[in-house]
Amino acid sequence: MTTDRTPSPLKVVLTDLNATVVESWRAAFADVPGIEIRHASLLTAKVDAWVSPTNSRGRMDGGTDAAIKRHLGAGIQLRVQKAIREQHAGSLPVGSAVCVPSGAVNPAFLIAAPTMRTSSQNVSETLNVALACAAAFQAVHRQNRLRPGSVRSVALVGLGAATGKVPPRVCANLMWSGYTLFNDHHFEDDDDLRATVLAQLDDLEKAPPTQRVRITPPARGGSAARRA
């Protein structure tokens, strides 16, 4: 089920070394207050949680994942995989995420939100970016429900824009869709989140590159999406 919620005070930092991704974010999030956009490495972001666009097995062996593992130490992959085993029987579906202690001061937490099932998978023709982004923010909800106020800020890279081959503007628009869904609704379970996004598959897929789609939960007896 979904429940309406008031706008979150969560600080969101979008940060990437790819200048085209950064410019695409600036276009997609131009009218969104409270978003910090940086042309910089995720590893320099001073926040409570980093989002790692991992794969379903939690293997941190390439791209952003590998950089995070080098920075935080090999133990971070073990923590992520332990959480995946305990909470998802060893395979974390796209549209789900886990939040684990990082073992560091900055960030205190790492959120693993897969954009692909296996390493180096091309996800450019999927909605995996929207699913992963929305799932990452739902993980913030869950962590703050367990420990209120423990995640007040979060940093994300361009999900799927490197290894996943998602075009930067498409990536930015899908991340906008995932972020606005987080602000509008709190999902009680991941299946509900996935069903909500996938029910609006046509709207998201058919939107031109410069047009964003605001996802809304399915109405009783149907579904809806608004274009922005």
Language-model features, listed with the residues they occupy:
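Macrodomain-like recognition of ADP-ribose-binding/processing modules
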Residues: 1-228
